[in-house]
């Protein structure tokens, strides 16, 4: 199963023998053997028994809490791995070091090239769209990355490339009733609501991968250090945004798996919230995407996106520890 999502309000999560049992109103909703679990994600309100928590920690299964509007609340997970050498290399590369600058270039190159790849695929399917100008801007930005030697300037290039992508995002939406507005948290439109939710799920999965490898998730290079921010998780998830989350969102909208009726608007705050049924459908699509296979261009074999999160984390660790000369971002062509 991999990840178990608890989408039922007022659910109770307990342990029976070697199984996790999910109940609501004394009715058993799910029973999953611990051996089949890698993570549990609770969306909304649910109660977890102390026995279940102890068993999850014992089996190194993370427990994540996400609010009903897709806001990441926190994760309970086992202690960091004992690989102090990875964290030592990570900290030594902090700041404006050549390694940090190179890593930031890689994160941004991967993100922008995958943005361009997404636009290229869509343009091929719908010749009436006018995505070429945005693709040209993104490519021009990518071409400038090697000419910049400080992280702040690289961040500026990342912003310019992202602006070109999101500037044509509405052209990628083929269903009525959905309009993308500038990125906003909390979301005040349905597309941003899906993005916030999807990126929260992606952040959790990438953070889990970097924890497995042995990184300190709070020390990133692209994202400015801030108290409580898992900077490295945000860094490494950049190259997966278009490939995983944006792809799932466009699939859900354009194939009418989600409709405007799957969203509600809070009367006072105008925050847009995905319904319980809508969350369930989105989670199905997200898990299916994570389990889908592709040929990884660096390792040269088929893998799932879930496996790719850890592969990229391990490649970054190898680079920082001097085992390889460059960090190769995941780029699909």
Predicted regions and their residues:
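Short hydrophobic alpha-helical runs that function as membrane-insertion/retention elements
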Residues: 40-43, 61-67
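Short gly/pro/ser/thr-enriched loop/turn and capping motifs at secondary-structure boundaries
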Residues: 49, 70-75
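Hydrophobic residues embedded in beta-strands of well-ordered beta-sheets
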Residues: 20-21
